[in-house]
C-alpha cells in the first residue's frame, strides 16, 4: 500500500488564497536543446508539499531524453524538465498535510499512481496504468521532472530523512529502490551466489543489495574496467569480470581472462567479433562462452560450491543492461532451478534461447521501477551510516551492510544553468582528466 503523510509533528499550513511565484527550471525542448527558463509555481494545494530541490542525480533515461528527446519508444512531444532522483527541503505545506514541518529534509518518490485501481490496492502501484512519473514522456501533458528550483509534490510520496543521511545518498534512494525491488523479486537465500551484468549505478546498487540480502558471492560484469574495479574496491561486489568492448582490436578474446589479485578479471590477447555480426547460433555460442568465463572466477572455490553441479551456474542473475547478448549470457550463467531478474530496459524485441530456461526450470522475472521500497532504503542507509561513523563494517542481520553510497557521486555541478554540462559528462564513463564517471549530480 502507499505510504501516508501522517504523524505527530505539527504541520504549518498555508492559509488564504493560493499565490504564485517564479522559479528557474531547466527545460529540454529537443535533442541537446536545454534551456534555463522562468516558470510560475503556485502554493501547494491540498495534500501537497512544496520542496526546494537540493540534489538531483542524472539517470540513464535522462541522458537518453537529452540526446534524442526520447527514451526507447517514448518520444517527448512538448518541453520537458528532466530529473527524478532527487532530495530537498520542505519550504511550504499545503492544507490537510500532517507529519511535516518547514525545513524537513525529504527524498522524493516521483511516481504518482492513481491509488484506486486493483493493482494499486494490491500494493503493486508501480504497475498502475495511470501512473504519472516525473521526467517521463509517457503521460501527456508530461509530468515535469525535478530539475527546477522548487516543485509541489504529494506529501504521501515525500519521505522524511534522518539527519545522518546526506542529500546525495537521499537522491540515490531512487535507483537504490530499483535494486531493492529487484532483490525482493529474486528472494535469494542466505549463502546464495549472484551475478550482476552491468556496473552502472543500478548494477552497483543491485550488487550491494544482493550482498546485503545474504548472497555470499556477487560477481559483477561490465565492459568498463574502471567501474568493475570500483565495485570490488568499494565492497559492492566480491568478484569482477571485465568484458571486452566490441571492435577493440588489441586486448582480448572473450574466453581468455586472467583473475587478478583484486578479484577482477582482465583481458589477455585476441580479437573479439562484434555480436551484431554473428548468426543467432553463433551469438548463443558466444554468450555460452562468456557465461563460462564469468563462472570460472568462483567455480573452483570449495567455500562457494559444495558440489560440481552447483558450479554449473549462479543461483540468481540480475541483468541490468537490457542488451540481448547480456540476456543470453544471463540464461547460460544461471544454474538449473535458478532465477534471472530482468532489471535493465533495452532492446524491446529479443531472440532468446528459451529452451535453456524451459529445460532447466530457470525462472525469468521482470521488474519495473519499484514499490514499497523507500522506507527499507532509508533504514538500510541509516544502518550503514551508523556503522561507518562508528568505524565498523561487515554484516548486519543476514548479510553485509550497504557500502557508503555517497562515494558513487563522482561529479557535481552547481546551478541549473550548468545542466547541459552535467548531461554531457553523464553520457561518458571517464571525464576529460581520465577520472571515472559514475553518478553525476546537479545542485539547484
Spans of model-derived segments:
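Glycine-rich phosphate-binding loop and adjacent beta-alpha segment
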Residues: 2, 233, 245-285, 321-395, ...
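Adenosine-nucleotide cofactor-binding segment
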Residues: 196-199, 211-327
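Glycine-rich beta-strand-centered segment in the early N-terminal region that forms part
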Residues: 42-56, 70-121, 162-164
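Glycine-rich helix-loop-beta junction characteristic of Rossmann-like nucleotide cofactor-binding loops
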Residues: 184-189, 309-310, 332
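Short N-terminal strand-loop motif that marks the start
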Residues: 1-86, 149, 153, 258-260
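C-terminal hydrophobic helical "lid"/dimerization subdomain
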Residues: 2-20, 254-255, 263-265, 303-306, ...
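NAD(P)H dinucleotide-binding glycine-rich loop of Rossmann-like/cofactor-binding domains
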Residues: 75, 114-197, 245-246
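N-terminal Rossmann-fold NAD(P) dinucleotide-binding loop
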Residues: 203-204
